From Swiss-Prot:
This is PF03932 family protein CutC. PANTHER family: COPPER HOMEOSTASIS PROTEIN CUTC, COPPER HOMEOSTASIS PROTEIN CUTC HOMOLOG. Keywords: Cytoplasm. Belongs to the CutC family. Homodimer. The gene is cutC. One of its GO terms (molecular function) is copper ion binding. It is found in: Cytoplasm. GO terms for cellular component: cytoplasm. InterPro entries: CutC-like, CutC-like_dom_sf. The lineage of its organism: Bacteria, Pseudomonadati, Pseudomonadota, Gammaproteobacteria, Enterobacterales. It comes from Escherichia coli O9:H4 (strain HS).
Length: 248
């Protein structure tokens, strides 16, 4: 049966995902940045309260995946922290200036991760040559690759995802970006073994008083009175679709 991973941005969302049938959580911060490393406090609270596998993302900033020496040092330290806290896996990825896997740095990450299952995230979708990259990731011992098939969403990239799945000795290919209940059957019919979804929506802040003349963001148009939350009903619906597909 296909595995359902839910992207969560808080301990509360991780619990919601678990309670509604998620098989695994990718734990992140900063949804508007596409997911950054969670704080130590969030990591500890999730580790204490969530019983399904949780894989934190290790990504020090938004933007591209070519990191400075200081950023890479932080990545290694965060990998060690996640390992010490007892998480079963993590999510990360590093590219070089030419859009290839930065093999020396990824080798250091794999050494720091030790027995943890490492997912190479959507840095894969920014790489120059996906099949060569897949070979490199297999050589590193990467457990799985999260990808949209190098398109803006995974449904558009499904043909590439199927090509990657068919590649000999490839890591597990997990489809993600825009995967929802209404299109999930396309991925299941294509033989995708793992799917990744945020399964959520922006929810209004409970704050009643709002100083509309002041922003804490560098983006003057940002809505600072909303937060992204996992929709438990959406998770349950996706899990039900997977179970019914398996029963066919």
């Amino acid at each position: 049966m296909a595995l359902l991973e839910i992207c969560c941005y808080s301990m509360e969302c991780a619990l919601t995902a678990q309670q509604n049938g998620a098989d695994r959580v990718e734990l992140c911060a900063a949804p508007k940045e596409g997911g950054l490393t969670p704080s130590l406090g969030v990591l500890k609270s999730v580790r204490q309260r969530v019983t399904i596998p949780v894989h934190p993302i290790i990504r020090p900033r938004g933007g591209d995946f070519c990191y400075s020496d200081g950023e890479f040092a932080a990545i290694l330290e965060d990998v060690r922290t996640v390992r010490e806290l007892g998480f079963p896996g993590l999510v990360t990825g590093v590219l070089d200036v030419d859009g290839n896997v930065d093999m020396p740095r990824m080798e250091k990450i794999m050494a720091a991760a030790g027995p943890l299952a490492v997912t190479f995230h959507r840095a894969f979708d920014m790489c120059a040559n996906p099949l060569n990259t897949l070979n490199n990731l297999a050589e590193l011992g990467i457990a799985r690759v999260l990808t949209s098939g190098q398109k803006s969403d995974a449904l558009q990239g499904l043909s590439k995802i199927m090509e990657l799945i068919a590649h000999r000795d490839a890591p597990i290919i997990m489809a993600g970006a825009g995967v929802r209940a209404e299109n999930l059957h396309h991925f299941l019919d294509a033989g995708v073994l793992e799917v990744h979804s945020s399964a959520g929506a922006w929810q209004a802040s409970p704050m009643r008083y709002r100083n509309q003349g002041l922003s804490m963001s560098s983006d003057a148009h940002a809505d600072e009175y909303s937060r992204y939350v996992v929709d438990g009903a959406a998770v349950a619906e996706m899990k039900g679709i997977i179970e019914r597909h398996q029963a066919k």
